[in-house]
Amino acid sequence: MKLNSVKKVYLLGGGGTLLGFAKELRTRQYEVVVFTSPRHSREIMPGGVTLARELDSQGIPWHMPEDVNTNAVFLDGITPRTMGLGFGEVWTFNREIIDLFDGKLFDFMGIPLPKYRGGAHYTWQILRKSRLGACNIQVINEFMVQGEFDSGEIVFAREFSYPDTARIPRDYFDAAHKEEVAFLREFMDRAENGQDFTLSPVPEQYSMYFPRLNTVRQGWINWSWSTLDLELFINAFDDPYAGASTELDGQVVRLKRVRTETLDGPFHPFMTGLVYRVNSTGVYAASLQGSLVVGCVLDEHGADITATICTGQRFFTPMERLEAAMTFHAQYDAKGAKT
């Protein structure tokens, strides 16, 4: 497959990597058009403003169709020299759309395919202590369902490792962004130089699927877990997400910026969640093998209440909260989370 005839690029979806690639393509003199969704358009970019505002400030044309399969602007703009590349787009493409691109409709996948299919990739990876990252350009076929299933051939791929300092999703996002933009530059360099890309099948025997998550509904802390598992779980729902949830005196609170210490432990199971020390380094809560040192406690509305926490209080999650979290199935559409 050669792509050196491409002059126009449709970017579909959202995220910082899409924005970075759009800017890169503009410097290479490509015609760039972005097709996004309401939830993607509201995403905050590295500069602190929304994707929509960033695109406007860069003079990059963008559209927000309900369904690209029936959108006249999308359909009428496709030419034999148009390439499409998705970044978490919300649409599934029909056979007619795929044929219009003549094999040049792709998806960018920032995961080590076929592992971590689904959603909430970094949360799942943090829970499993996985530091393997990857970038893939994958052919979109009619069987692809965004966030559920993909089987198209791999056009171009690279693997990398997340640094040992990466602890929370924000760390993974930041590290991945640099790798992804560099990967896409290399992809375009090779395409412009006339490389004949070889399509490779996805090795399905290694497939792993983990579903999308809803932090508020599913990120509830089970204080019976080991100290390490508590740390991993709370880190996995840290920035840019709302934080892992529990209760304090019957009120919902969310924890962030945690670390563990073993100097004071272990603790009896009856002691888990008890706040036994508060000082300038954090709120110390007992857990089975040691201390969970919490750097930030937020109320349900996101206000920092760390300074109000006192010794003798207990973080506790009722069983009904835990059962609801384990049985909830997160679903998203173009507007955001479905309730």
Identify what each model region corresponds to.
Residues K8, E24, G88-M208:
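Donor/substrate-binding cores of folate-linked one-carbon enzymes
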Residues N69-P80:
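Short amphipathic alpha-helix with an adjacent loop that forms part of the alpha/beta core around
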Residues R212-W225:
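Acyl-group handling in specialized metabolite and lipid biosynthesis
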Residues P61-V68:
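Short acidic-hydrophobic, aromatic-tinged amphipathic segments that line or gate anion-handling sites
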Residues H40-D56:
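N-terminal beta-loop-helix "entrance" segment that forms/cooperates
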Residues V32-H40:
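Short internal beta-strands
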Residues Y10-L18:
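Glycine-rich adenosine-cofactor-binding loop
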Residues N222-T339:
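An anion-binding loop in the catalytic cleft
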